[in-house]
Amino acid sequence: MIKLKIKTGDIVRVIAGDHKGAEGKVVKVDREKNKAIVEGVNMVSKHTKPSAKSPQGGIVKKEAPIQISNVSLIDPKTKEATRVGIRVEGDKKVRFSKKSNQVL
């Protein structure tokens, strides 16, 4: 498992693939598979049978995971895609934007 620099709640932009240019909030990060679920990106149709949970059944749209390498964090200051660095401030590790050098 590698150290991921994208966390749940971050605003990211898709930089490669079918959904290139789309932006959204990270809902979930799967560290073992190096994938993230981004709100409103990579929507798939899931066919569900009627059950106690959903008596109607039918087709449900939901987000599918996307590779972490295909997303880039958006810098809150410049609103552009940026790389993320990690540095030690005091006795804590903090993430910072490589473009604006601002702590995230």
Swiss-Prot record:
GO terms for biological process: translation. GO terms for cellular component: ribonucleoprotein complex; ribosome. It comes from the Bacteria. InterPro entries: KOW, Rib_uL2_dom2, Ribosomal_uL24, Ribosomal_uL24_CS, Ribosomal_uL24_KOW, Translation_prot_SH3-like_sf. The keyword Lipid metabolism does not apply. The keyword Iron-sulfur does not apply. One of its GO terms (molecular function) is structural constituent of ribosome. CDD domains: KOW_RPL26. It holds the Pfam family ribosomal_L24. SUPFAM superfamilies: Translation proteins SH3-like domain (SSF50104). Keywords: Ribonucleoprotein, Ribosomal protein, RNA-binding, rRNA-binding. Belongs to the universal ribosomal protein uL24 family. Part of the 50S ribosomal subunit. One of two assembly initiator proteins, it binds directly to the 5'-end of the 23S rRNA, where it nucleates assembly of the 50S subunit. This is Large ribosomal subunit protein uL24.
